């Protein structure tokens, strides 16, 4: 895959100015985390404000971890999200019930785990591969073993976990993902993006 066609999602957004800068850079999607245990959690009230002026063709992704069905429905009703991203132990039945395109995140340690997720979540728009961690649900800043990713997966996958301006070109050259998802690798502090790191990340991919 030509690196120039890699899709880019910047996740863990908490500020309007960071979202606008990401849009100016040409990213395809921005992620809002609706998970109280995350340092990047945003409330519905704040989310309404910071996504107020997002233009067409930039997707808003709601990132959730083992949410209640009613909470997911509330987000769909209140925020103009295009995609749901489930980061917990949600079943395929749970994810699909909202009639909304969804991404299923997994934290694989083996190729078999990746293939099993592709099979189980057959109706997901994509599978997101993130670093296994006992403490955090994403945003760890740690990479995982890219060698475990099977070749010729039948479903698009999104590469996440410890990506930054220094390793992103190696990652996409080695793994050929459909898209990449960056969070801590473009931050000054959790939830506060560093605009220089953001621009360098984009430049490393698109030139």
Curated annotation (Swiss-Prot):
Pathway: Amino-acid biosynthesis; L-tryptophan biosynthesis; L-tryptophan from chorismate: step 3/5. CDD domains: PRAI. GO terms for molecular function: phosphoribosylanthranilate isomerase activity. InterPro entries: Aldolase_TIM, PRAI_dom, RibuloseP-bd_barrel, TrpF_fam. It comes from the Bacteria. SUPFAM superfamilies: Ribulose-phoshate binding barrel. This is N-(5'-phosphoribosyl)anthranilate isomerase. It comes from Legionella pneumophila subsp. pneumophila (strain Philadelphia 1 / ATCC 33152 / DSM 7513).
């Amino acid at each position: 895959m030509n690196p120039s066609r890699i899709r880019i999602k910047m996740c863990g957004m908490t500020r309007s100015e960071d979202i606008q800068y990401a849009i100016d850079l040409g990213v395809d999607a921005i992620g809002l985390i609706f998970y109280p245990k995350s340092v990047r959690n945003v409330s519905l009230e704040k989310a309404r404000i910071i996504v107020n002026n997002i233009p067409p063709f930039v997707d808003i992704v709601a990132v959730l971890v083992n949410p209640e069905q009613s909470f997911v429905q509330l987000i769909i009703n209140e925020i103009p999200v295009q995609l749901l991203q489930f980061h917990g132990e949600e079943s395929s039945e749970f994810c699909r019930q909202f009639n909304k395109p969804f991404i299923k995140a997994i934290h694989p340690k083996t190729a078999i785990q990746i293939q099993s997720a592709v099979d189980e979540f057959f109706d997901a728009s994509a599978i997101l591969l993130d670093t296994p961690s006992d403490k955090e649900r994403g945003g760890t800043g740690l990479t995982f073993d890219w060698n475990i990713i099977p070749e010729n997966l039948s479903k698009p996958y999104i590469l996440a976990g410890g990506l930054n301006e220094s390793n992103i070109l190696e990652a996409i050259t080695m793994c050929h993902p459909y898209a990449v998802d960056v969070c801590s690798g473009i931050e000054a502090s959790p939830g506060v993006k560093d605009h220089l790191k953001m621009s360098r990340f984009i430049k490393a991919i698109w030139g």
